Every structure is written in structure tokens, then in C-alpha cells.
Amino acid sequence: MRKIMLNGQWELAEAGNDRLCEVQVPGSVLSGLYGAGKIEDPFYRTNEDVTRELFRKDYEFSRTFVAAEDILKEEKIILVCEGLDTLADIYINGQKAGSADNMHRTWKLDVKEFLHSGENQIRIVFRSVLKYIEAYEYEDNKEIHYVPCGGMKGNQLIRKAHCMFGWDWGPQTIDAGIFRDIYLEAYSHPRIEDVKITQVHWDNAVDVCTTVAVSGNAVDKCQVRVTIQEDAESVCGHRTGANDRKTEAHVCKVGETVSANNNPAVLTSSIHNPKLWWPNGYGDQPLYKVQVELLDEYGTVLETITKRIGLRTLTISQEKDLWGKEFAFCVNGVKIFAMGGNYIPEDCIYSRITPEVQKYLLESCKRANFNCVRVWGGGYYPSDHFYDLCDEMGLIVWQDLMFACNVYDLTEEFEENITKEITENVKRLRHHASLGLWCGNNEMESAWDHWPEVQSESKYLRADYIKMFEYIVPKAVRAADSETFFWQSSPSSGGCFDDPDDENRGDCHYWDVWHGQKPFTDYQKHYFRFCSEFGFQSFPCLKTVESFTEEKDRNIFSRVMENHQKNPAANGKILYYLSENFRYPENFRKLLYVSQILQGMAMKYGVDHWRRHRGRCMGTLYWQINDNWPVASWSSIDYFGRWKALHYMAKKFYGPQAVSMCMDGDIMQVYLANESMDAQSYQVAFYVKNMECEILEKLTGTGTVGVQESAPILAVDVSGWEDKKYEIFLEAEVTLADGDVLCDVETLVPYKYLELDKPEITAEVEEQGDAFVIHLKSSCFSPFTAIGFIDADVTLEDNFFHMTDGEEMCVRLDKKDIRNGEILDAADLTQQMEILTLA
């Protein structure tokens, strides 16, 4: 097979008009215009309003390429477009070769008849989706009125990432373009059409069944060879006879063959003493390479497809128990407590989503002790690279299909389109070790059940929902992947409008803290089986705000700051919660900092509670991990990759072992959650300290917490400190057998009432090979101490930490964690460093 890449330099123009500029493909209208200096940064100030209007026009991308004579001799020449956004007409040498209408699909067109020897032209016209929506004609009684928060009317009529039309955390950047690879494939031989890999686990062995479908002429003369390797060394292979589908599996050192005349060809290989794949925190992530080769009658390799798999069983357990039915990921027979967050598209301009960006975000998840990420259904299906990284890092993927918070008009054309979309993406992703479940949609069953603005829609649209998500979608998923657990919606109790928000079954989304302005303590009233969404907003750091504002804009109620806040009344909510917990900050920068502390406290409150009730609750996925532009939002990592306080706190509250405290009347209970596969012996010390960090009371204890157990380890009556509650804080310190020390701090009154002194913090920096170590001392209790840097972006080993005694505290910065700038030496780090404190 010959491959001609068409990435690189293209020309961008308004359709039918002169050239505007060059654009690098993968690229888009916005990336091209901004890169050429034709428009300002789309994210700066209120430029969103300007860029939105650009997409009332049609645009075209064009370039030339050379097709050599030997290419034209091939029987098939296929144009492969892995990402066209969205309504596109493709022309080769002025002749229309085909059209596309779904950014979630790969489009393949046979273009041989349009090519000639020498220079050829390809032109792709992207039609305005806004004009398409305006011209859309509904059937009688099926006009859709519902619009998602922050979105645009009609967004659900197009198979385009819904959040590109705006969301309550994202702008209306309705971009268009070629956002993934585009290339030609020329060949005359049969091709591998599909590879499906399934596993059967039995006594210390795994049977790997590889099903290979082949298309083209002379298939009966071809052979298929499958080789399974780990670390580049073959561990097994298997051959079946030309007419056999099953034989006894055996281990051998070379890949062996089966006739492709059995189409599909089925090969079963057996791996004894397999190395099992585990989620992060439960074991290693060994991967096996499955290489599938198509050979002609002479043994020449015609095509090779390689997929990486992990050997594991992975499903959702829904066993009945005394509370209802559990909802827990079960990996290799072990029920795990899912800890993670919701992942949205990494950028509004999709061609800027690089493997490096994905790797950084997922590494940040792993470093914060995540074992699960939910790919949310209002965005897009990430690249193969994303799932490869999740496989490597042990991050279970809760995979939504791309339907979210919407009402759909189910026409015949729409049904055909989404069925192909689902089939293609399920086949593409089904082999990944990290794939935990398929979910039909986000919040749509719940919306039809009790959202008034959705319930008021036509009964015919409700019928469309039932047909789509009870029949069409699950049928398409199961036809392509019968192995992976399917869940109709999130939240849900299993579909069919059977009380989708039932706390005792399925998964739940909980938003009374935040949208309902309930206090953090409200989390303790709920015992969800699996909380797949809950969240709290914060502002990004000052450096991020400076990227999209002028100095005059730096007030949270300015026009620009409100433009970069897409949730109505959210800034007021932040101030409300701030007033409940903290004194009003003295300046704008401090306000941003305190908002992040609030966010971290809220999420910690919920996660600590649910981890204390492991067994009843078996998962927490907070909303949300990342941003797609610089904005005030629920994210724990901002658009530029800067960790907020929440992400540093998550590293602790999602730790394999985590200590927490909660009040029960006059008793302060200290809990230790252990999610590891080993029992944990501990020593616990409980302190009452004053603002000078002097110990007023100390209690100790020892014990062991079992495997995957959460238990109270110390109970302290604190009623005797009522008269001193404004002058003290409480600290629990747990030392594990391996020497790790875990700490938690609580107060008896909100921080706003504490008589905090202004801390004097000294900092000395030492360079130690590949790292810097920051040595800190504080003159008094300094909660939520934060270290920032003027120029470089860094990820510290710890941040937003409590300084609870006069002893030296050390914070490590690995040099590899310095980004977007440089730190030359210890003196330079000292000069760039800024320390923020609550008092």
C-alpha cells in the first residue's frame, strides 16, 4: 500500500473569494486566521463575539499534490479524512468527490477516477453550520426549543461537538476545518477490514481471540498471521487449519497463520501465567502487542495492523445489597473505588489538541492519584493516542457517546449517521485495556424525567429519545462490542426512566452544593453509589487572567471577566460561599487565590465523606479536570496547564491512603481510608494547637486498617475547647508503616472567624541535581500556603499546604516540571517565587 500525506500547507479562503492566508493542516479557520495575523487572539477579552460572526460564511481549504504514474496504476485510491469539521464538500480537480456531515467520523472516498498524472488539486468547502441550522426544516410537532446553558439553538441538529456552540464553561467558537490527518491510500491488494480482540480468562491463563475481517479480491489466496508480544519478545501465537475455527490453544515462539478464506478469520492464542493489567494504584499496567499481518499466497506481507491490549477483566458490578444495588468497577475480580474527574475537550480550536497536551493532562491525573477519567459526551472522541496513554497510566475510561444535555430530532438520516459514528468509534476503541464502560449520553434521561424545560418539548421528541437510547444506540454499541459494559445515560438507574436519580442505584450527579447553594456539609446527607458529577467553581490564577484581560478588566464583575465566566450568577455564588467561609480578600489576586481554596475544600468535603463510606459509595468523578479556554470554571487544571488548589488537594484526598476528620456531635472522628491491596498499620496523633502552633492537647493511637477498607481510627471529644474555638485548630497526623505521613487539618469555626496572625515565612532554595528543594518556615499557623512563580510555570510536589508548626517544611520541584519558561538556578527560583497566605 502507498500512502500520500496531505497534511501541511494549504490555502484558506472565503468560499468563492480570493485567498485569505496559508493554513497548516491539521488546522482550522481560526488557527489559520490567527496564525496569519488576520484576527486577534480569539480568547482575548471579548473577541469571542467577533469570531462567532465569522462562521456565518463558508470557507474553503485547498492545496495541490502530485500523483505519480505508478500510484495511478493501483486499483484503489482512497482519500481518508480522519477529521472534517463539519459540513464539507470535497472536490478533486474541480469535480465533486463526496461530502461529509459528521466531525465524529472518518470519511473515506474513492477518488481514483478524479486523479491524473502529475499535479492535482484538492479543495474542501466547509459550509456554515449556522446557516444550515437557520434553514433546517422540522417535521410537524417536532421543533426543538431547548438550548443548553451557554449554548446556541439548533446545536443538536449537527454532528459537531456540542460545546463548540458554547457551554456553561466554554465559548461559542463554531470553528471549521481539517482537524486531524488527511491522506491518500493507494493499493491493489486485499485489505484488513477489521480486527476484533476478545479475552477469556481461566486458571492462570488467558485465551486471546483475534477475529480478522478481510476485504478485496483474491482473499481466498491470503493468509492471516497473528503474533502477540510483550516487550518486543513473542510470547505466543497460534495457527488453525483453513477450515477450522477452533483448535486447542498452545504457546509457541512465532506468529502463525490461518487462511483468510474463513472471512472473518478467527485465531485463538493462549497466554499462560499472564501479566494482568491493573488500574493506577492497584498494580502494574503491562501491555501486550497484538500484530495482525495479511500475507499473499507467496508469504509477502500486504498489510500490518498492530494493537496494544492489557490482559484483564473489567466490568461494572451491580450486586444487590442492604442499600439497593452497588455500582462499582470490578477489575480482575477486585471491586475498586473509582477516583477521578470529568475530561472535556482540551481546546476550543481542535487542531491545537496535540499528543503533548493530552499527555500532560493525563500525567497530571495520574500524579493526583486518579484511577479513572470520564470522557464527557458534549465534546468529541479523543485520538487513539489519548487511550494509549490511559492504557499506560492505568486510567479507566468512562466513555460517553457524544450526546449531552440535549433533545434530538431522530430522522432517518440522523439515525443512519449516528449509527455509523457509533460503530466506527466503538470498533476503534474497544480493544483498549483502559476502556471501562460505554455510556449512551450525559443527563438526558434525567432531563426528560424532571427538567421542566425538556419535559415541555413535544411528546414525539420524547419518543425519539426512547428509540435512540433504549434501542438504536445500545444495539449499535453491542453489535460492535459485546464485551464492554453499556450504561444508557448518566445519571441513571439502568434506563427506561426508572428513577434515574435514585441515590441507591446506578450513578448520580449532585449539584445542590454549588447550583443549589447548599453548604458543604450537605454532602454528608447523601450516600450515592457512584457520584459521576459534582463540582465547584473557582477563578484561574492571576497569570492566566492576565492572558485575556487588560489591567482595567481585572474585576470579577467587569464585562471581560463576565465574558470569561459562562455560568450565569456563578461569580455571585463564589462570593456567597466565600462570605460563609472566609474574610473578604484584600485585593483581586487574593480573591482568585481564595476562590481556589474554596473549590478544593468543597471537593475534599465530598470525597472524604464518600471514601469514609466505601462499599456503599464506590466512585467519585468530580467536575471537571480541564478547560478548553482561559475561564472561570469548575476545572482543577486551567487552560494553560496550571494546577489549581483543587488538583494539589486531590493528590491527597485521592491518595491510596487518605486521612480525614468529621464532626459527630461533640466528637471529632479521625478516619483512615485505605484503597491499596495491602493492609496498613498506622500510628495516629491528634493535636489541638493554638495560632502559634503550640500543642495544647495530644492524643495517640495505633492500629491496622484492612485491604480496601475505610475505618475510624480515633475519636476525640472536643467539647472542652468551645471557649477557645476561635484560637485553635485541630490536626490529625497518621504515620504509616513505610514512613509516609498523612495529615489533615480542621477547625471548629469557619476560617473567617479564626484569629489568624499574619505569618512571616522564610524560604531558602537548594539545588539538588535534577531538582530544587524549597525550605520553608512559618512564624505561626499558615493554612493553605501557596507558592507561585512570576515567569515559569511549575508543578510542585505539594502546594496549598498547611504550615502547622515551627519545623522546617520542604517542597520539591523537579526540573522536568518546569514549563513555559526557565529557572536557571536557586537564585533565579528565589527571585521568581511568590508566596501567598490566607492571613
What are these regions (language model features)?
Residues 339-341, 373-375, 397-399, 530-532, ...:
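Hydrophobic faces of well-ordered beta-strands that scaffold small-molecule active sites
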Residues 1-372, 612-613, 617, 642, ...:
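Secreted/periplasmic carbohydrate-active enzymes, especially glycoside hydrolases
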Residues 103, 168-171, 278-279, 342-355, ...:
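The substrate-binding groove and active-site-proximal loops of carbohydrate-active enzymes
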Residues 321-327, 383-385, 420-428:
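Alpha-helical scaffolding within the catalytic cores
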Residues 368, 372-416, 500-517:
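Aromatic-lined substrate-binding rim segments of carbohydrate-active enzymes
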Residues 336, 366-373, 391-398, 431-437, ...:
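Loop/turn elements at helix/coil->beta-strand transitions in domains of secreted/extracellular proteins
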Residues 14-15, 174-177, 438, 475-478, ...:
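Substrate-binding clefts and catalytic carboxylate motifs of secreted carbohydrate-active enzymes
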Residues 392, 409-496, 640:
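Active-site neighborhood of glycoside hydrolase catalytic domains
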